[in-house]
């Protein structure tokens, strides 16, 4: 309950942001949407759950909310930008860089967003990425619960 209460406001704001960004892409920038809106929404929900759970895990190691926010930015920004496929395609990454690309949720969501927007993909093709995001959510939430129990003891 405690973790869900901390996560819910971020979840709501992030899903609203996703809807606004999709609308802007479609109507302001004229990017055609060819795939499944439900798949993009589902992938977006899983991505937000995974990333907010990662934030909860990082906050378990800090004393203040500001420290948690800064820590999350420092720990996730560079790997997300460099290895998610945002700048360099993940298919061209090798070795440790390729591993880093799979260890953060952003790359998996980027595959979902690009797949639904430009390649007309739906859940039948994007289920591995959705499963990975769900795995991140379960893993980060599970570790957060373990850390919370250790703090209470």
Regions found by a protein language model. Name each.
Residues 19-28:
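Short membrane-interface helical motifs at transmembrane helix boundaries
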């Amino acid at each position: 309950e405690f973790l869900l209460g901390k996560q819910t406001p971020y979840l709501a704001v992030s899903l609203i942001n996703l809807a606004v960004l999709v609308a802007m892409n479609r109507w302001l920038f004229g990017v055609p949407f060819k795939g499944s809106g439900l798949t993009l929404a589902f992938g977006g929900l899983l991505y937000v759950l995974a990333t907010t759970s990662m934030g909860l895990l990082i906050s378990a190691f800090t004393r203040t909310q500001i420290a948690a926010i800064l820590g999350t930015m420092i720990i996730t920004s560079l790997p997300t930008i460099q290895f998610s496929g945002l700048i360099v395609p993940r298919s061209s990454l090798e070795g440790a860089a390729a591993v880093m690309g799979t260890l953060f949720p952003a790359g998996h969501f980027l595959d979902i967003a690009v797949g639904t927007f430009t390649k007309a993909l739906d859940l039948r093709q994007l289920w591995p990425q959705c499963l990975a995001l769900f795995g991140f959510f379960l893993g980060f939430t599970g570790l957060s619960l373990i850390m919370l129990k250790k703090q209470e003891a």
